[in-house]
């Protein structure tokens, strides 16, 4: 989509951590790009075929807590199931008192030979430098992960 956003996502310098900024014309798109950016820290999502799917539902009172739970759930799927997400993610963000994400992630079981390895493994999500805001016509989601 075109809306003036600078990119889908980008990385910033941060020692022992990775600062991720994800962008979207909608808040949903920014959350999807935040997920793709997380995966790209470790492997190439463009090499992941959408062979399998996982349904994810997370909720929280505010957007920052929702982002934390969303990214944390993706880390769990990779750690526990070796589920590598592709760029295909169907995500719906609902506001009903609090916030809820209902998403279907498409991907495959991670294979270093098929999906590559950047040399970095994300250990944990943090609240450090977290920011979610609308900038003109697009949304920016920023967060830091420990590597």
From Swiss-Prot:
Pfam families: Archease (PF01951)
GO biological process: tRNA splicing, via endonucleolytic cleavage and ligation
Binding-site residues, Ca(2+): 17, 146-147
Superkingdom of origin: Archaea
GO MF, one annotated term: calcium ion binding
Keywords per UniProt: Calcium, Metal-binding, tRNA processing
InterPro entries xrefs: Archease (IPR002804), Archease_arc (IPR022952), Archease_dom (IPR023572), Archease_dom_sf (IPR036820)
Similarity-based family: Belongs to the archease family.
PANTHER family: ARCHEASE, PROTEIN ARCHEASE
Role played: Activates the tRNA-splicing ligase complex by facilitating the enzymatic turnover of catalytic subunit RtcB. Acts by promoting the guanylylation of RtcB, a key intermediate step in tRNA ligation. Can also alter the NTP specificity of RtcB such that ATP, dGTP or ITP is used efficiently.
Protein's recorded name: Protein archease
Species of provenance: Pyrobaculum neutrophilum (strain DSM 2338 / JCM 9278 / NBRC 100436 / V24Sta)
């Amino acid at each position: 989509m075109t809306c003036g956003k600078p990119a889908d996502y980008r990385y910033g310098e941060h020692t022992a951590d990775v600062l991720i900024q994800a962008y979207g014309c909608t808040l949903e798109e920014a959350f999807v790009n935040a997920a793709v950016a997380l995966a790209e820290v470790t492997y190439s999502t463009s090499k992941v075929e959408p062979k399998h799917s996982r349904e994810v539902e997370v909720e929280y009172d505010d957007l920052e807590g929702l982002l934390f739970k969303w990214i944390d759930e993706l880390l769990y799927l990779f750690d526990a199931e070796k589920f590598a997400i592709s760029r295909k993610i169907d995500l719906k963000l609902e506001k009903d008192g609090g916030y809820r994400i209902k998403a279907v992630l498409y991907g495959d079981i991670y294979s270093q030979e098929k999906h590559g390895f950047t040399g970095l493994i994300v250990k944990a999500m943090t609240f450090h430098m977290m920011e979610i805001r609308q900038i003109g016509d697009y949304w920016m989601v920023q967060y830091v992960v420990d590597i």
